[in-house]
Design a protein with these regions (language model features):
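Active-site-adjacent core segments of small-molecule enzymes
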Residues: 2-19, 24, 29-350
Length: 350
């Protein structure tokens, strides 16, 4: 795979949706009508199937592995919520009890041997196992924004990255056309191009990207966004380190760090105000919004991917316990369909 195409591939791989098509000419008709298909009854699932096919076309089918965020490893730990967050949400996440967490760190894209220093999103998936038996998922990436405001953008970008049959490479004119036609891609693309990759997952912030609704005991809703801030501080590779970095270092760095004690993140919740975007994960909220500490995540172990408790978890971001609800963000809802298809395929391959 040529370098320029690889960089664009990983740049769109921020969630379990991102990749590009390498052999999708039969789906051209679908791509020409992605907006109408995605918005029609059953269309969300059709686009999700096409996206998963595209992942396999771009990266190959790696049996038993996730179609995206393929490279990663597992972890376990616990979360303790705050009373302040409990005033805004009746979720058991914020009862103040220690909640069991199973997690996974990952690199965007469908390449199981991706370089740990590539300029692509890093992921953190968390499953909270509440004492009442309910499950709650939080799935995040390390960029503050996403690249697409609608599901149709996915296939548009994948088709722009399709290999030309004659050259075996993506057509630069199609890539340029995509960039021009989809300005919602620009913010994340710029972030990845100008921000060096993290030196360790322990030094990596993670963003929920979407807007969610907290529901309190009286039924009042509050729009929120959240991020997880590393207690060890944020740290990116320097330019010199980026050049010299080995292909593999993230697993070893986390193993070494967790041996020293729990690796912690603070969950920071931002309170939305009227006019703040509810349904567009490419748009950041203005600075200066009220923020609260909603809890502390502590991770205490490392496990290789397929030996970890996270291996069989879907990390569907629409898996929410009572007290937290989704907005009408079409990308958030689309992720659920795409994750389910990826999960189903890999489970049948094990």
């Amino acid at each position: 795979m040529d370098t320029s195409r690889r960089r664009l591939l990983v740049g769109v791989g921020g969630l379990s949706l991102g990749a590009a098509v390498s052999a999708v000419q039969p789906r051209q008709a679908l791509a020409n009508e992605t907006s109408s298909v995605a918005g029609s009854e059953g269309g969300e699932e059709l686009v999700a199937v096409a996206v998963n096919d595209a992942l396999e076309g771009a990266y190959g089918r790696h049996k038993g592995k996730r179609r995206n965020h393929t490279k990663g490893f597992g972890t376990t730990g616990y979360f303790v919520g705050t009373k302040e967050a409990g005033q805004l949400s009746r979720s058991a996440l914020f009862d103040g009890d220690r909640i069991e967490v199973i997690g996974r760190f990952s690199i965007a894209g469908g390449d199981p041997s991706a370089s740990d220093s590539e300029r692509s999103p890093r992921g953190m998936g968390l499953e909270f196992r509440l004492k009442n038996g309910a499950l709650h998922h939080i799935t995040m990436i390390h960029t503050p924004m996403f690249f697409a405001r609608t599901p149709s953008t996915f296939l548009d970008k994948f088709l722009a990255l399709t290999k030309d049959a004659a050259t075996g490479k993506a057509d630069p004119s199609k890539l340029a056309a995509f960039m021009k036609q989809h300005p919602d891609n620009a913010a994340q693309f710029h972030f990845l191009e100008t921000t060096n990759p993290p030196a360790s997952y322990a030094n990596c912030p993670f963003y929920g990207i979407h807007t969610f609704r907290f529901v309190d005991h009286a039924g009042k809703t509050t729009n929120v966004r959240w991020r997880f801030v590393p207690e060890d501080g944020e740290k990116s590779l320097t330019n010199a380190q980026l050049v010299q970095a080995p292909r593999e270092f993230l697993e070893a760095a986390f193993q070494d760090r967790v041996k020293q004690g729990p690796v912690r993140w603070e969950m920071i919740v931002t309170i939305g105000e009227p006019g703040d975007s509810e349904n567009d994960p490419t748009v950041l909220w203005p600075a200066g919004r009220r923020e609260i500490k909603a809890g502390t995540l502590a991770l205490t172990s490392f496990a290789p991917d397929q030996a970890s408790g996270a291996y069989k978890i879907n990390f569907d971001p629409m898996q929410m316990a009572d007290g937290i609800e989704p907005t009408d963000d079409p990308v958030l809802r689309f992720r659920s369909s795409s994750y389910a298809i990826s999960h189903s395929r890999r489970q049948t391959e094990v």
